[in-house]
Amino acid sequence: MNRRKFISGVTSAFLLSISSQLMASDTSETEHKSHDMSKMPENWTKDEQIAMLIYPGFTALDLIGPQYMFAGLMGAKVHIVSETLKPITSDTNITIIPTTTYDKVPDNLSVLFIPGGGESVIKALSNEKLMNFVRKKGSKAKFITSTCTGSLILAGAGLLNGYKATSHWVARDALSAGGAIPIDERVVIDRNRITGAGVTAGIDLGLTVVSLLRDNLYAQTLQLLAEYAPKPPFNAGTPITAPKEAVEIITSMFGNYTKNAQNTVKKALI
């Protein structure tokens, strides 16, 4: 066994252990003998089916933030979906193993979730099998959701036409290529479309979706469990608050991204 496979195996075991503690998939079958559950309302256990798409080069934190919240839905089943069951490597070289494939995802989805990425999103928009999966499941899902540039994939699938939506700030304007109305907000809800802004907004999106599937108290309880009370060391999380030099660096790095994304979204719609 080589070093990479060993690390992958240890990581998978660790994540499996964490997910079981956080009431992840098939939580209705999990006994929490070490926890006193008597204070929890009886109606807090349901049976949602949640599909979270992954593809080569997706942004890991786009997935992990919402997944933590979705995994806390007692009784829900969270599917990590890709074309095959082969491990998928993220933008930061974290390897995630899918739990199911496109053809085995239930039709009665409570949530379809799409993470974003950089150039990987451009490639995903040109992937016919991936886009057909998003179109098919998105046409029936109760909630259609995304974080960061994942909304570009929704736009390319024709699922945001006429809807308000957001994305990472460097790509937000590209949403208009799919008929969406770009909105500068951390989380945007328009009917059953729920989109999050860049990367870390996935945590906020996850809590928002949880509150809609269950109730505000459930979401607040998960927020407390996660101790999600961010106080970043810098106030540079948006182009408005960040130093001019930082904005110029990022804008220069992604100067052609919006145009490329717009063109690719348009092609995906044809």
Where are these regions (language model features)?
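Flexible glycine/proline-enriched surface loops and loop-helix/loop-strand junctions
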Residues: 117, 188-192, 203
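Extended, subdomain-level signal for the structured scaffold at the beginning of enzyme domains
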Residues: 2-144, 152-155, 172-173, 182, ...
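A conserved active-site-flanking secondary-structure segment within enzyme catalytic domains
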Residues: 160-187
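Residues at secondary-structure transition points
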Residues: 125-128, 166, 197
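Conserved Rossmann-fold dehydrogenase catalytic segment
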Residues: 184-197, 227-228, 239
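Short acidic alpha-helix initiation/capping motifs at coil-to-helix transition points
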Residues: 198-202
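Structural detector of well-ordered beta-strand residues that form the stable sheet scaffold
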Residues: 144-145, 166, 183, 194
